Amino acid sequence: MSKIYIVAYVYGVVQGVGFRYSTQRQAQQLGVTGYAKNCDDGSVEVVASGNPQAVERLMEWIRQGGPRGARVDRLLTEPYPPTPFETFSIRY
């Protein structure tokens, strides 16, 4: 099965609540690689690559609100250029 690559912009209460770390943990459990990064506008950018089912499960976890303390108001996704990621990291 081929990998898919997407970028997701997550809006709501997603900074200062452990969102990136929880997303990293969830991605690692699913075998998804990429990164999570806080954006200046208060959103979080999540780039995810992996098999389509695993990436969709990660996106569904985010859609449902992510970690305790977070609130996801909006999730926008779009294709991302194929990029080799070894792990799922947190970027600063």
Swiss-Prot record:
Keywords: Hydrolase
Enzyme class name: hydrolase
Domain Acylphosphatase-like as annotated: residue spans: 5-92
PROSITE patterns given in the database record: ACYLPHOSPHATASE_1, ACYLPHOSPHATASE_2, ACYLPHOSPHATASE_3
Active site as annotated: R20, N38
Alphabetized GO MF terms: acylphosphatase activity
UniProt-listed Enzyme Commission number(s): 3.6.1.7
Alphabetical list of InterPro entries matching this protein: Acylphosphatase, Acylphosphatase-like_dom, Acylphosphatase-like_dom_sf, Acylphosphatase_bac, Acylphosphatase_CS
Catalytic activity: an acyl phosphate + H2O = a carboxylate + phosphate + H(+)
Similarity remark: Belongs to the acylphosphatase family.
HAMAP family named in the record: Acylphosphatase_entero
Protein name, UniProt field: Acylphosphatase
Organism: Yersinia pseudotuberculosis serotype O:1b (strain IP 31758)
Originating gene: acyP
